[in-house]
Amino acid sequence: MSERLKILNNIRTLRAQARECTLETLEEMLEKLEVVVNERREEDSQAQAEIEERTRKLQQYREMLIADGIDPNELLQTMAANKAAGKAKRARRPAKYQYKDENGELKTWTGQGRTPAVIKKAIEEQGKSLDDFLL
């Protein structure tokens, strides 16, 4: 809570601040505060109505499923199984290029991601092309 809201929430501080204001100013502030409170009540009641409507619809669909002989838990299990089956890992890409690194070891590269420094250096400085490194 911000400091300003803490001041509004403390009766002693409000009384001290109110002594410095005219009655007209205090009444104007009260009207504005009432408008804000009413707006907030309206928002809360609208949100509650939306929740109740959603709950009513969910209950209606549940009853329709039961009337058709479908157990809602069975439907959820089927949905979860389909979701799990759809998340298969993709196959590893086969190597497309072969090169020797700084240590003289033979390495491969799929062509995905950053170009290895050895290949990049050979292309830029020695005038080679990627085709020279094909497997």
Curated annotation (Swiss-Prot):
InterPro entries linked to this entry: H-NS-like_N, H-NS_C_dom, H-NS_C_dom_sf, Histone_HNS, Histone_HNS_N
Gene3D superfamilies assigned to the protein according to its UniProt record, in alphabetical order: H-NS histone-like proteins (1.10.287.1050), Histone-like protein H-NS, C-terminal domain (4.10.430.10)
Annotated GO MF terms: bent DNA binding; DNA-binding transcription repressor activity; minor groove of adenine-thymine-rich DNA binding; protein dimerization activity; structural constituent of chromatin; transcription cis-regulatory region binding
DNA-binding region: 112-117
Localization in the cell: Cytoplasm, Nucleoid
Ranges in a coiled coil: none
Domain of life: Bacteria
Keyword Repressor attributed: yes
Keywords: Cytoplasm, DNA-binding, Repressor, Transcription, Transcription regulation
Matching SUPFAM superfamilies: H-NS histone-like proteins (SSF81273)
GO cellular component term of the entry, any: protein-DNA complex
Pfam families hit by this protein: Histone_HNS, Histone_HNS_N
Family: Belongs to the histone-like protein H-NS family.
Listed PANTHER family: DNA-BINDING PROTEIN H-NS (PTHR38097:SF1), PTHR38097
Assembly and oligomerization: Homodimer that oligomerizes on DNA into higher-order complexes that form bridges between disparate regions of DNA compacting it. Interacts with Hha and other similar proteins.
Its biological purpose: A DNA-binding protein implicated in transcriptional repression and chromosome organization and compaction. Binds nucleation sites in AT-rich DNA and bridges them, forming higher-order nucleoprotein complexes and condensing the chromosome. As many horizontally transferred genes are AT-rich, it plays a central role in silencing foreign genes. A subset of genes are repressed by H-NS in association with other proteins.
Protein name: DNA-binding protein H-NS
Gene: hns
